[in-house]
């Protein structure tokens, strides 16, 4: 739609295995109900993202547990649903490593080694991690950025787990920001995942929030 320059409202019927974006928008996963809500709904403007010359709806991520979203065979997804991603993540455990990157986040420079990173506009990340809904606004022109490095010891692991469960993110191993634009400098061998699809790595990646760039049809709110 963006490539075509079209402003046509989009009706979205969630049919995937995880449906993170639909969960954030509170869309029905029942096909007939979703279709009826589209027919009777109203168009609402939402942010989307650009990743160099590509677009994504709700998440761009790299590192631990991100490969499974595009590497898991479709027949396994169909048979097991969300469990297929969990099993794929378990297979990735021996390959988890720290990844050196440099970032500029709305002018703030960061450099470090991270095992996971996500740029998202969703309260649910891979169905495994929930971001505090009070921190997520799909129409504010900003993404939530989460970077997680390897913990140093069991005490820091416990602190990190508590910070994720409490949705406070006040842990030395976690960096959390809300930004509208970021630039990433990395190894070109590091692939990303955009809405569950593989994006081949680049040395420099620019990610930008496209403020209210698309219109999605949603169920009308009760007066």
Predicted regions span which residues?
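Short, acidic/polar N-cap/turn motifs at the starts of alpha helices
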Residues: 45-48, 98-100, 114, 133, ...
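Glycine-rich phosphate/pyrophosphate-binding beta-alpha loops
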Residues: 61, 65, 118-134, 198
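Gly/Ser/Thr-rich active-site loops/lids in small-molecule metabolic enzymes
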Residues: 76-83, 124-155
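A generic structural signal for short beta-strands and their flanking turns/coil linkers
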Residues: 97-99, 113-115, 139-144, 178-180
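ATP/nucleoside-binding phosphotransfer catalytic cores, i.e., glycine-rich phosphate-binding loops
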Residues: 105, 111, 137, 147-223
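Residue-level signal for tight coil/turn positions that link beta-strands
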Residues: 52-53, 140, 211
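Catalytic core of DAGKc-family lipid kinases
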Residues: 2-119
């Amino acid at each position: 739609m963006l490539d075509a320059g079209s402003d046509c409202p989009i009706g979205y019927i969630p049919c995937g295995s995880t449906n993170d974006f639909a969960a954030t928008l509170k869309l029905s996963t029942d096909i007939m109900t979703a279709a009826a809500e589209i027919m009777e709904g109203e168009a609402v403007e939402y942010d989307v993202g650009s990743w160099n010359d590509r677009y994504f709806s709700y998440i761009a991520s790299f590192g631990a547990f991100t490969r499974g979203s595009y590497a898991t065979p479709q027949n396994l997804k169909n048979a097991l649903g969300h469990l297929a991603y969990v099993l794929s993540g378990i297979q990735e455990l021996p390959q988890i490593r720290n990844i050196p990157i440099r970032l500029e986040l709305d002018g703030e420079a960061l450099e470090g080694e991270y095992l996971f990173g996500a740029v998202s506009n969703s309260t649910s990340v891979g169905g495994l991690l929930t971001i505090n809904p009070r921190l997520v606004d799909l129409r504010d022109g900003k993404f939530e950025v989460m970077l997680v490095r390897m913990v140093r010891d069991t005490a820091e692991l416990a602190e990190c787990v508590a910070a994720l469960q409490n949705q406070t993110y006040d842990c030395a191993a976690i960096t959390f920001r809300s930004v509208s634009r970021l630039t990433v400098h990395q190894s070109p061998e590091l692939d990303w995942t955009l809405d569950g699809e593989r994006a081949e790595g680049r040395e420099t990646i620019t990610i930008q929030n496209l403020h209210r760039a698309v219109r999605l049809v949603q169920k009308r709110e009760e007066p």
